[in-house]
């Protein structure tokens, strides 16, 4: 993607303080977008934006609880009052390990609240702004768990299946409005969440278990956040102007090459 492809575009990234979201923030800024880093962790969001600015990019940050309608409304109104919202990346999300038998109602509702309700609220707020301007681009982070049976991921799979379905519905409803909506469905990505999970559950065996996780991917390793970010940059650019209503698997062969 040409380095000036996103010049002057305003991008809002939820969950932008860590993992895939943070990598997407950095990649968009490197391609000349002005990035708003949103995260429930205010200090981490500020640091993510500061890193971008120190590297010569343009970034601002705001604390945002994506599951709280008042928080989302206030944040998006604040951003819109300063200009446009050309790009929305819904990367905020939480994970949960468990089968239907071991998932509590509280955990189920917590996953729904953040992953589904949060994506809905942010899309709704961004689209209201995009309809008043020349359009925009929305990218939701779904997962291979939305379309493939993943063990011990019942509530997470439910939530990402909903994200995928919302993506297609929004893309359909926004045809003719110059608003494109797609989702990216990664397989395993080596993020701080993975490291934290291994440290908590396999102390002293982190390297061994990381290698085991890598073996579950047909390509032989987990994805890097920066690789997902590269796809996101392309989807935000005019080079992808023909692409909407797509669920793009970023899976190292998981869907078609396992077994």
Question: Model features per residue range: what roles?
Answer:
Residues 2, 148, 233, 244-259:
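Short C-terminal tail/terminal secondary-structure segment
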Residues 5-36:
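Canonical Rossmann dinucleotide-binding motif of NAD(H)/NADP(H)-dependent dehydrogenases/reductases
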Residues 99-100, 107-112, 213:
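Substrate-binding pocket helix/loop in short-chain dehydrogenase/reductase
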Residues 103, 149-157, 169, 197:
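Active-site loop-to-helix junction immediately N-terminal to the catalytic Tyr of the SDR YXXXK motif
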Residues 123, 159:
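Active-site helix of classical SDR
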Residues 128, 172-176, 241:
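Alpha-helical segment proximal to the catalytic Tyr-Lys
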Residues 143:
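Residue(s) in the substrate-gating loop at a strand-loop-helix junction
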